[in-house]
Regions:
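Short, Lys/Arg-enriched N-terminal segment that forms or immediately precedes the first helix
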Residues: 1-3
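Short helix-coil-helix linker/hinge
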Residues: 6-11
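HTH-adjacent hinge/linker in prokaryotic transcriptional regulators
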Residues: 12, 19-26, 30-113
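Alpha-helical scaffold segments in soluble metabolic enzymes
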Residues: 12-16, 45, 61, 102-105, ...
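Glycine-rich phosphate/diphosphate-binding loops that line cofactor/substrate pockets in enzymes
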Residues: 113-125
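Glycine-rich phosphate-binding loops that contact phosphosugars or nucleotide phosphates
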Residues: 123-243, 249-256
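A short, charged, Gly/Pro-tolerant segment at domain boundaries
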Residues: 258-275
Length: 275
């Protein structure tokens, strides 16, 4: 009904989004402008008409809406559609395609101003603690390893009692990161809430912008990959989370290359058992 009140250019935008919603979640504003023959300023005005700050906010909400409207009954067991006739190579290609798609989706969903804000907080923090349970806890351990190699103090915590105790002991100047694909893991949400109340800078890494986890976060980084209820071990989710952490890590190294190099050499020497 609202389409009738829109300009012709805005109507083209609306019709394109309705026809190709998932493609829009992986498009830049320039892509959408080109496909609809509407100026980028028109795209932004269209998003603001719908109540969003801009295209990035609209795109995030659209991706979340597409993910949550999937029927639970049709939730797949695997990331890729695998048939009985697929051989090992064919399955490998499908998994490769899954990872490629989810990384493109994640790059489009990330708000780079939020990313740079997290990098700045990490550069100046006293310590960083990463909270996550289950598969997200394993991802947190990987980031802990990366940060230790470049000299940042902190830990990855997945035991809920340890998470709560550590979170409440944080203070201003510390950073707490919560990893949860759904953004609803109660242990991780509670840990980030305690950390925020203690004065720490809080960061959420999740697929769900409207989640309880993001409500407790100063910065919310959105990773891609629509995941079904049966996919707690999803390779797409794991790749998306690792991509976000690797982006933060790479930007940290870029910002202080000499410090990163010195810390890496010291930690490498410490691990050399032949000395």
């Amino acid at each position: 009904a609202m389409q009738k009140s829109l300009t012709r250019a805005s109507q083209r935008i609306a019709q394109y989004i309705l026809a190709f919603p998932r493609q829009v979640t992986q498009s830049s504003i320039a892509d959408l402008s080109r496909e609809t023959q509407a100026g980028e300023a028109t795209v932004i005005r269209f998003c603001r008409t719908l109540g969003y700050k801009g295209f990035q906010d609209f795109k995030m909400d659209l991706a979340i809406e597409l993910a949550t409207t999937e029927s639970d009954d049709s939730s797949p067991l695997l990331d890729a559609e695998v048939s009985e006739s697929d051989d090992a190579h064919a399955i490998g290609l499908k998994l490769q395609n899954t990872i490629s798609n989810v990384l493109s989706e994640t790059l489009n969903l990330l708000d780079m101003q939020q990313v740079l804000g997290v990098v700045d907080a990490l550069r100046h923090c006293h310590s960083v603690y990463i909270f996550g349970v289950g598969s997200s806890g394993i991802t947190a351990l990987d980031m802990k390893h990366k940060l230790m190699r470049i000299g940042l103090r902190g830990d990855a915590v997945s035991n809920n009692h340890f998470m709560y105790m550590q979170a409440t002991l944080l203070k201003a100047g510390d950073v707490a990161m919560g990893v949860s694909h759904s953004g609803t893991s109660p242990e991780t949400v509670h840990s980030l809430r305690l950390a925020r109340q203690a004065g720490a800078t809080t960061v959420a890494i999740t697929h769900n912008l409207g989640s309880p986890l993001c409500e407790e976060a100063d910065f919310c980084l959105i990773n891609g990959n629509r995941q079904g209820m049966l996919q707690g071990d999803s390779i797409g989710t794991k790749a998306a989370q690792l991509f976000v952490f690797d982006l933060l890590y790479t930007l940290l190294v870029q910002s202080s290359p000499e410090q990163a190099r010195e810390s890496k050499l010291r930690t490498m020497n410490a691990l050399d058992m032949t000395k």
